């Protein structure tokens, strides 16, 4: 079987375990062929969840809120389910430049946020500001998704949401230590991101192929977590992509991200009900859970159990 996997962004160290599995052919002798599809194919005009729901790919990487959107809030004949999480820890943050004078979220009132046109980003930032004592009064601009960080560095707006083991390392190597505001520091629960998702119907038909893929990828991520420097060398040597040309940069990025891949039991991919429930409860409290017709959906009406499974990871 050929599995097509839609990446959530251009290739980067989030995808390290995926590429380790491919480079080392960890699914050899299984008959499985795997193709990774980057958002670059259309400059991120179509979300990965849309590609998944429309049957273009078998697996999609995306934040948890995209799954909620397609699974619960839209009329869809192709329900999707999370089958693994890439990271256990939150690795993103809202950031400002060191010379901006903005060192706390409350100082973002009246400022401009450069966004990605995705669910919840404005609501999360507003809540972050309010949790720090501000009003949450921000303006929003939306450059092309793949250009947001460059526009931020050009000071077209004061704040953006970045992945610290990538954009954070870029800024670090430019001598720009970013002011980073983490959601968890302000008691805002955020879902797993990114997660791997698949259509339930396809999972039922091809369960063995998904198990082979996920268990190989888990080996790749364990290797990346335990040997970040060696993994960096492997990626730079084998990946013909502009993002993987600078060994010093990739090594530093791998060192930053490696502690986030595994849980306390040294397992990759496992999701916990408590985190899903806390996230959905927060969405309910902020009136962000809505059905496709716009009516409110409460956390009490939503069981998170059907949203995800750990059963394909081969560790239970």
Language-model region placement:
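Short, glycine-/small- and polar/acidic-enriched structural segments
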Residues: 2-136, 140-149, 154, 158, ...
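Conserved C-terminal helix/tail region of periplasmic/extracytoplasmic solute-binding proteins
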Residues: 277-316
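Pocket-lining segment of extracytoplasmic ligand-binding domains
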Residues: 151, 156-243
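Short Gly/Pro-enriched turn/cap motifs at secondary-structure boundaries
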Residues: 8-9, 187, 271-272
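Solvent-exposed, polar/charged alpha-helical surfaces in well-ordered, non-transmembrane soluble domains
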Residues: 50, 106, 123-126, 150, ...
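Positions that flank functional sites
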Residues: 41-42, 67, 167, 186, ...
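Short, surface-exposed acidic
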Residues: 135-140, 241-253, 289-302
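Secondary-structure end/capping motifs
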Residues: 206-286
């Amino acid at each position: 079987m050929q599995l097509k996997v839609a990446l959530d962004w251009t290739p980067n160290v989030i995808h390290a375990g995926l590429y380790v599995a491919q480079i080392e052919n960890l699914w050899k002798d299984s008959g499985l062929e795997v193709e990774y599809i980057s958002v670059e194919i259309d400059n991120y005009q179509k979300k990965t969840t849309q590609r998944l729901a429309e049957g273009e790919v078998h697996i999609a990487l995306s934040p948890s809120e995209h799954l909620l959107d397609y699974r619960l809030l839209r009329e869809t004949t192709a329900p999707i389910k999370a089958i693994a999480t890439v990271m256990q820890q939150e690795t993103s943050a809202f950031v400002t430049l060191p010379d901006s004078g903005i060192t706390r979220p409350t100082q973002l009132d009246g400022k401009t946020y450069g966004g990605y046109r995705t669910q919840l980003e404005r609501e999360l930032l507003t809540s972050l500001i309010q949790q720090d004592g501000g009003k949450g009064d921000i303006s929003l601009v939306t450059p092309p998704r793949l250009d947001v960080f460059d526009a931020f560095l050009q000071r077209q707006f004061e704040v953006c949401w970045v992945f610290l083991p990538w954009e954070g390392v870029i800024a670090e190597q430019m001598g720009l230590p970013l002011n980073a505001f983490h959601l968890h520091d302000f008691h805002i629960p955020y879902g797993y991101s990114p997660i791997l998702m698949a259509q339930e119907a396809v999972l039922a038909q091809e369960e063995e192929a998904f198990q082979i893929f996920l268990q190989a990828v888990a080996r790749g991520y364990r290797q990346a977590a335990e040997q970040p420097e060696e993994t960096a060398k492997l990626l730079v040597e084998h990946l013909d992509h502009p993002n993987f040309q600078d060994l010093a940069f990739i090594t530093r990025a791998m060192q930053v991200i490696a502690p986030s891949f595994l849980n306390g039991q040294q397992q990759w991919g496992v999701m916990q009900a408590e985190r899903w429930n806390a996230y959905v409860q927060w969405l309910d409290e902020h009136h962000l859970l809505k059905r496709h017709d716009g009516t409110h959906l409460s956390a009490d009406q939503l069981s998170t159990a059907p949203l995800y499974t750990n059963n394909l990871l081969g560790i239970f």
